[in-house]
Each structure stands twice: as C-alpha cells, then as structure tokens.
Amino acid sequence: MAQYDVAIIGAGSAGALIAARLSEDPARNVLLIEAGGRPSDPDILKPSMWPAIQHRSYDWDYKTTPQEGAAGRSFAWARGKGLGGSSLLHAMGYMRGHPADFAAWAEATGDERWSWEGLLPSFMANEDHVSGGDGIHGKDGPMPVWIPDDEVSPLTQAFMTAGNALGLPRIPDHNTGQMIGVTPNSLMIRDGRRVTVAEAWLTPEVCARPNLTIMTGTLTRRLKLEKSHVSAIELAGPEGLATVTASEIILSAGSLESPALLMRSGIGRENVLREAGVTCRVKAPELGLNLMDHLLGAGNLYATKKHLPPSRLQHSESMAYMRAGDFSAGGQPEIVVGCGVAPIVSESFTAPAPGNAYSFLFGVTHPTSRGEIRITGDAPDSPLIIDPRYLQTQNDRNLFRAALGAAREIGHRPELAEWRDHEILPKSLAASQDIDTFIAKAVITHHHPSGTCRMGKDEMSVVDADLRLRGLDNLYVVDGSVLPSLTAGPIHAAVQAIAENFTTGFK
C-alpha cells in the first residue's frame, strides 16, 4: 500500500495549486489524484470557443432537478473533468469580489484571514497582472490576468459608454476593491490563449519533482474512516482498484464531488445517508446544504442595424456591476448587466443568427436562494440529486426585476443607437407577474456552484476556519464548496486565493 505525507483529491482550480505549493518542500511526499485525464482538445485554448466546449469528454455534465422558479427547466451544470478542473471550461473571467463579500466570510468564520485584507496577499501571489507591482495587483505569479483594450468589440465600447452616461464610473478593472462601474472583463488569457490552472501551476518543472506523484484517470471511491481519522483512500484507476494512505488528506474535488465523496464515505446528514444505503459514521448536519449559484438572464435581446463582428474574446466582454435602482450609487454590488457580443438566450427562446443580434445579460450578485445536493447510493456512479432551488426568495425575484430594468435602460440609450435596430426580447412587459415569467424562462446558470461544505465558526458548519472537516483530525476541504456566501462575481479567483491562503498556513 503506497503511503504519502499529503494526498490531494481533485486537480482543479484549488487542487492543482495546492499540489504545486506543497510539493515545493522536497521533504514532503505529495500525491495528486484526478478522476479525469490530461485533455488535449485544442478548442480549450481558444477563448472564442466558450461555451461551445461544454458537454465534451472533459465535462462531468451534471443535470439539476427541474426548477420551479425557472419555468420547470433542468439545467446542465458544466464541471471540468481533468487536470485543470473547471478552468478547462469556464469563461476565463478574473474577478476577486468586493471587500464586503470577504468581510462576511471573516464574520462567518471569526477569522480575519478570510477578510479582503487577509486574502489580498494570496490574490497577489497568484497573479501575473498587466498592472502588477502597484500594491494591489500581483506580478510574476503563475496565473496571467489580462485586461483587453483594442480587442474589445465596438459594441462593448458603446455599452460601457452608455453605462457611464447613466452614472456608472469608468473603473480600471474589477479587482481593486471597487466593483461598481464599467470596464472590460479581466481575463485569464495569455497571448490570445486560455490559461488553465494546470498550465499555470502544474508546469513541466513542477510535474518533474520526485516528491510529487500525479494519478490521472483515477476515481476516488471513498475514504476509509477509523474513529476520527481517515485511514485510507480507496481508488479505481487504469490498473483497477487500489488503496493508498496519507497522513493528511485535502479534498478539492469541487462543490459537487467533494460533498458527494464525503457522503459516500459515511459523513453527512443521517437521513440522507440512510436513504442512500450508507452508514453514517460522522454526523455533518449541513453537508450538502447551502448550495449557491449565480444566475444570468439571457437575455435582453436586440436586433442589429448592421453586421456585428464576432467577439475575439469570449462573447461576454464586459460585466457592469451596480446597486439596484441607482446607477450612481457606490458600495457592494447588488445586480450586474453584461454585454454579450452574440445573441445569447436560454433554450426557452430561439436565437437569431450570429452577427444579427446581441444580448445584454442581467443577474443578481448575492442571491439568497439556497439548495442542496444528495447522493442516491454508495457507488461513485450513483446519480447525484442537485437541487439549487433557483429564484425561491422574494429578494431574488425583486432584484432580478431590477437587473432586467437596468439592462433595458442601458440597451435603449442613444450611445447604442449605432447598433440597435429594435428590441427582440422581452418586448413589452406590463405586470410584475409577466416580468417574473419572462425571467423564469430566461435565466441560465453562471456556473458558480458553491457552499456545500461551508466554513464557519459555528458547530453546524462543515469545516472550521482552518478548513478542517469537523469530527476528523486529518481531513481538509479546500475548494468552492467551503464558501459561506457568494462573492459578487465569478468565484474562480476567490477559490484560488482560498487555496493559496490555505497552503501558507499548512504545516
């Protein structure tokens, strides 16, 4: 039986970073386990191929339950399967979040390490930012952060000018602590190519370290528990079943697979485990609960007066964050409007041909609806029940109305007259019920599932402020599942900062 000092389960946005950082110590024997392979599809590297690369062999391609708040639709949840995890598939946006987001984390955990100030060194350590070295952005880190300029579509330029005319300030980027305003999206792109976390952290030099073992195509079946200790990890790989041991185990399989593996191992809510035929060995009353995600309305659709050239980036080029009902207000964002240089609509509607229309996406930055994930059996291939319970709170419905209103106000501005012929969707909506019906049909996932193993200072939380799983002495969870609440924008930058912050304190 192979033995390691540290075993990391999952080579995605957190796991790849953790493996690279912890293996910097040549005396530490590190194992990185990944269920997927080493994807070589050249389309991954092409920013303009997002989101067309979803549903391929390196996508877990989950499905949610039908959502009452979204016109009864089920949603496809793209989750990366392979070295790099969901950085293989995401929209490449790099947005840290607002300082108030992290103040909520510090309050939830009772630990200032999770505040904006506490996480800033971790953000900067990860970044190779075009503005790096200015005291707020990192320089020479593994992950490039690029702000487009001439590459931005003229439609996006007009969108930003329209937002500015309404009172939104022009900001340098989304990552200075001020998110409200207009700016091109910061992107994890170098020389016109997507950069995954595998490329950034698992470089040939890192992979050649004698103290780092990387297993691909290897599924973690379950964790073997002895009292308050994980004694072994049961694997299924290319050569069949195997068991390994490690002094410390770090679970970084993501917001769906991390709680699923814990449940299959006998950790979780007693009733859920009992229904799945699993004996409960460690009670975790909130494991799998607190499931959060961002939604975007797709969309506020306009026909063009003239041909719209395709985006040279990733279609959604600028996200304008703002308060609801006041374009000139500052503080923590409540809603967002994004410029889509393509006719982006949900499957409820028929999209016009590319080049003939464009969409303004709209969403809520801090939704209060919460869902859950459950296992249905003890086998890794047993289906997961994923129920995000979208749009179940009045707060979310009210703010989505405000977000749609903001999108339409920007969309009808004179600054966009060069491009706008007429509005296709939603046309006239009189009553609140009509607006809610349209939104329910229009929303799509922003692909930010999180929160299912939330960190906190209370005993009900799944992990503590050190990210150690309550009830076990050698198991940590480090990925998007530990978020106690959502950041205002895409969560990828925050997940990387969580992983970096964790490694600095890991002994």
Curated annotation (Swiss-Prot):
Its cofactor is FAD. Optimum pH is 7.5-8.0. The keyword Membrane does not apply. Its EC number is 1.1.3.12. Gene3D superfamilies: FAD/NAD(P)-binding domain, Glucose Oxidase, domain 3. Keywords: FAD, Flavoprotein, Oxidoreductase. The active site is at residue 448. Pathway: Cofactor degradation; B6 vitamer degradation; pyridoxal from pyridoxine (oxidase route): step 1/1. GO terms for molecular function: flavin adenine dinucleotide binding; pyridoxine 4-oxidase activity. The keyword Flavoprotein applies. Monomer. Belongs to the GMC oxidoreductase family. This is Pyridoxine 4-oxidase.
